[in-house]
Design a protein with these regions (language model features):
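Walker A/P-loop
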Residues: 1-13, 37-43, 107
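Conserved post-Walker A coupling segment in P-loop NTPases
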Residues: 4-28
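Conserved alpha-helical scaffold flanking the Walker A/P-loop in AAA+ ATPase domains
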Residues: 7, 26-49, 68-77
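Conserved C-terminal "switch" segment of AAA+ ATPases
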Residues: 7-10, 95-98, 104, 113-158, ...
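Flexible beta-alpha connector loops of hexameric P-loop NTPases
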Residues: 20-31, 54-65, 110-114
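Conserved nucleotide-binding/hydrolysis micro-motifs of P-loop NTPases
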Residues: 22-24, 53-55, 89-94, 115-121
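Conserved catalytic/switch belt of AAA+ P-loop NTPases
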Residues: 53-104
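C-terminal helical "lid" subdomain and adjoining coupling/linker elements of P-loop NTPases
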Residues: 136, 151-199
Length: 199
């Protein structure tokens, strides 16, 4: 948002990040005002809707459809003063964009980011570990890369890419603390292959 402001594409530099819970009301008549309020707060900046596909849960979801209809109108009415970014998994986003005939045409630019490779996830895990004060034994690399590659093939959509790396590290840190109870002289910073649960 700041870069778009810097080049003059937007008058404001704010980023408003929301999910379904921020756009869909719990009662009849609450969704449109809620969605309009979010749009108003983003004017001049960027509205980022994470997991946007959650707005559409099928034809029976009248609240979600109302939020989508309100968004479409808001996007059209403020097309010169608002950038809207929708994020989500490819398959779910395709279904979402078909929920309203005007929705897909308002998002002509679609960018699909490929899933991380096992090597990239390993580097992400190492970076997170370093930020927490941990290092990985060199023997961790091959099993972790192999594990991440296998998990990505099985189902990248539910693994969450970077989230999978973080969760794997958090389990390893917990396992390391259990190991240190039995071996208090071991390094507090070093994670070993046995600390990782690579089912």
């Amino acid at each position: 948002a700041k870069y778009l402001k810097a080049i003059g594409a937007l008058r404001g530099g704010q980023l408003v990040e929301v999910t379904r819970a921020d756009l869909v009301g719990r009662y009849v008549g609450h969704t449109a005002p809620l969605t309009n309020s979010v749009i108003q707060s983003a004017l001049g900046g960027v509205l980022f809707i994470d997991e946007a596909y959650a707005l559409y849960r099928g034809g029976e979801d009248s609240f979600g459809l109302e939020a989508i209809d309100t968004l479409v109108k808001g996007i059209e009415d403020h097309r010169d003063d608002l950038v809207v970014i929708l994020a989500g998994y490819t398959k779910e986003m395709q279904l979402f964009l078909s929920a309203n005939s005007g929705l897909a045409s308002r998002f002509p630019n679609q960018i699909e980011f490929p899933d991380y490779s096992g090597e990239e996830l390993y580097k992400i895990l190492c970076s997170i570990a370093k930020g927490k004060g941990y290092t990985l034994d060199d023997a961790c690399k091959l099993p972790l890369v192999t594990y991440f590659d296998r998990k990505q093939v099985e189902d990248a959509a539910t693994n969450g890419n970077g989230r999978m790396a973080r969760n794997t590290l958090e389990k390893a840190i917990l396992n390391q603390s259990k190991r240190l109870v039995a071996d208090p002289d071991a390094s507090l910073e070093l994670l070993l292959p046995g600390d990782f649960e690579l089912e």
